[in-house]
Amino acid sequence: MAKSKFKTTFSNDKATTSSTALLKYINKKAPKGYKYEILYKGSDIYSLKKDNTDEKISFLVRFKFPLNFEGIKVTNPQDLLELSYRTQKEIVLDETLQNGSDGQPPTLVSLKGEVGKQSIFPIPFPKLDPIKLEWFGGALEIPIKRIPYASLSEIKLESESDNILHVSFLFNETNNKVHLNTNINFEYLRTIDDYFKFRDFLKNYSEGRVKILSKNITLRSEDNNDKIKIFEKNDKLYNALRLIQSKIDTKIPFPQNLSIKDVNIIKILFESYINDRVVKFKSEPSLKFTFDDSSNFKESFPITGKKNMGIFVPFQRNIKFLSVSIPIIENQLYTDTTVKTADLQDRVLILETNKNNESFVFYQNSEEYKEISINEMLEKKKAAIELDDIDFSVLKK
């Protein structure tokens, strides 16, 4: 049973001291077997209590049962106080009942006017020890706390929000059964490095090998294989990001959300930086290029209408993915195109792709740039991989 604190709200701000004569006067209104005593030192409020009680702090309050508290029908004061504790909600006392009627004395008497709102507040939940998760070769502690829950037979516990795993327990004290719910909190991961701090746990969790309360956390049998496949697929992506991160001077955030554009950039970065492999992709029907003054392309500027033309264009730019921006050299190779516009004055070239057109791209780290010739690019394209076929597998060298 919970202990309770009593709070009385009133407008007085000056302390008063009781006297024997004053108490005698007030106690004339007290029924037989009861007496009024000052509520606490310095207060001007007197509470009605049993005459034979030895408790230092006690008071009498009135309830009218049955009553509804937090959606539950309550029929006795013990359950009301218990439910107040379990829900961490105050009990607001009925002022009419406390003031007394039909000859009943008031439960509180103030020397300076009417007593205002009266409430009983529960004591806070105690702090709990963390729960321990275990798997072969590893362990993890998760802080938990008791959650207010409107029930006289069930207790709810949840993990603290800032953790890799969200855990929720619902204990039924009547039948001693426990309902357990767990979910991975991916928002806890800030960087790709954070993922690898918890990778061993996440892998064992996906395989149903983590123990909690001496039991395995298991996934439903009908989706267990799918969960494992999803973990393996995502794990390859995260490993690719870690490998890319090792090649650039930037920390990569953990991908909470991925756009198709992000995925495609990561694929090309992975094949270029890790596998040293050209990526083949589908180009737009029309390609526009603008060349600067230093370009020697104008020396062999093609004429409009020329067919079966190939073009190799390296240029420097910043690519953005997952809120990261990195400088690269992007090498583009297009085969079998037709010249639609060739503007020598503005140095603009517009090509149309043909049905046999092939398009290739290869990224280079701008800080480690080594110029690639068109012949080298043509040689590299022989081992090119289709963009859609990239699964973040590392080539054996």
UniProtKB/Swiss-Prot annotation:
<protein>
    <recommendedName>
        <fullName>Abortive phage resistance protein AbiGii</fullName>
    </recommendedName>
</protein>
<dbReference type="Pfam" id="PF16873">
    <property type="entry name" value="AbiGii_2"/>
</dbReference>
<comment type="function">
    <text>Confers resistance to phages by a mechanism of abortive infection. Seems to act by interfering with phage RNA synthesis. Does not act at the level of phage DNA synthesis.</text>
</comment>
<dbReference type="InterPro" id="IPR031707">
    <property type="entry name" value="AbiGii_2"/>
</dbReference>
<keyword id="KW-0614">Plasmid</keyword>
<dbReference type="InterPro" id="IPR053703">
    <property type="entry name" value="AbiGii-like"/>
</dbReference>
